[in-house]
Regions:
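N-terminal flexible/basic segments that precede or flank functional cores
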Residues: 1-25, 30-31, 97-101, 109
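Hydrophobic side chains within well-formed alpha-helices
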Residues: 19, 74-75
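Short alpha-helical DNA-recognition segment
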Residues: 32-51
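Residue-level detection of the helix-turn-helix DNA-binding "recognition helix"
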Residues: 54-56, 83
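Short, basic-rich loop-to-helix N-cap that marks the start of a DNA-contacting helix
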Residues: 56-69
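Short, charged recognition helix plus adjacent turn
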Residues: 69, 79-109
Length: 109
């Protein structure tokens, strides 16, 4: 979980979960859907689904719309998984450097 510190910084204490892991573990496995099967049902290349579930590719807007339609979820659900994953990875990798390099400014209310 990421928690905002009082000074505005972030404490990052959980591992990033790739959207492909969610797709694989929470949707494909319980429903018995293969990579090839999902690719056929979504009308996308097998390589796209394979790369996503093997956590080598992210979810695009096009893929999010297709997954949302197929699994009766929302495109926002899939895009938010991707956004959260990327932000958490970047916080873990670069936040301390960014905090040192970038001066904070506030807008007067």
């Amino acid at each position: 979980m990421s928690i905002m510190r009082p000074d505005g910084g972030w404490n990052v204490t959980r591992p990033a979960v790739h959207p492909g892991e969610m797709l694989r573990e929470e949707f494909m496995k319980p429903l018995g859907i293969s990579i090839n099967g999902l690719a056929l049902e979504l009308h996308v290349p097998v390589t796209r689904i394979s790369q996503i579930v093997n956590e080598r590719r992210g979810i695009t807007a096009d893929t999010a719309l297709r997954l949302a339609r197929h699994f009766a979820t929302s495109a926002d659900f899939w895009m938010n998984l991707q956004k959260d994953y990327e932000l958490l990875l970047t916080r873990q990798k670069s936040l301390k450097m960014i905090e040192r390099q970038v001066r904070r400014r506030t807008v007067a209310a």
